[in-house]
């Protein structure tokens, strides 16, 4: 066996690829990780601007209730105490997210769980009555579904505009199943996640990726598809984390995605919005949210030690060739198309498909690591 032969060629250095390489390397396997971008880390890559780790491909917050996963990532890099507590801005008024007693006080002035529940029940009943008046018993679209779950006020101010910007379609044109449930908390708790553990790697996500890939051979600026037969010939098995339809030369057609555009700017003040995440929930503001990156890793007085800050405005758009694919569009048509590719993938003996693009599935970070751990 020559020196240039590998047990695994791993296409893509995002969380799936990097975790796979780490665990395979620990078992003594010889791995090569290639990535078409100029950097490692996939979409969790951070760019350092003005001493601030900027989440180049959108905000990533690690959260899990799986102790095994939490212990694993903390064995690579220590995680900080960041807690995701977004704020919604609707026409200049601020509301806490997720929907909790703070939100209901801000919306209606109610101060007890009973008052809040009564107000929600009253608004839900009104929504059901409106549907009945139209001769409808089941919600026909997202708008009706959201209103029977949470009522008109919260829907109009905090859900409608944001959702329409995210999907590029009116809520009356979106299917009801997109919102299966809307968690309502009758407690004063702004922690977005219910998980036991959450945080951001101390020093940023690049520290996690570099730690996972320590001792593993990597090559950047390498496109697997430009020299496919060569890459396929240098390893016993391939771990593929790119787009599954591209792997099969789009033979059944192209899968659809939503993408996100980021306008990132340096601001000459230490604190722009006082929070990492502020959602803009009215339709008239073109962006969906503003991320202020320093709040992921700097707390209290630390915020003021750096006189500058970096913000990213997020714009959600329809994906076109050449754009970064972010979110799969799991409608009927795309799901059926993916099923055809999945059928081919299942027959592969020497290719492992994993991650958001290869499985055409939205993933949080922790489940990706969990999935790779199950393989080993």
Q: For the regions a protein language model found, what residue spans apply to each?
A:
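Active-site/ligand-binding neighborhood in enzyme catalytic cores
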Residues: 88-93, 101-235, 248
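Short catalytic/ligand-binding loop motif for oxyanion handling, primarily in non-cytosolic enzymes
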Residues: 41-43, 88-90, 96-97, 155, ...
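Short, well-ordered alpha-helix to beta-strand connector turns
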Residues: 6, 28, 216, 234-236, ...
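C-terminal segments that line or cap access tunnels to active or ligand-binding sites in enzymes
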Residues: 235, 246-374
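N-terminal Rossmann-like FAD-binding beta1-loop-alpha1 element of flavoenzymes
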Residues: 6-33, 376
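Dinucleotide-binding Rossmann-like beta1-alpha1 core, especially the glycine-rich loop
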Residues: 50-125
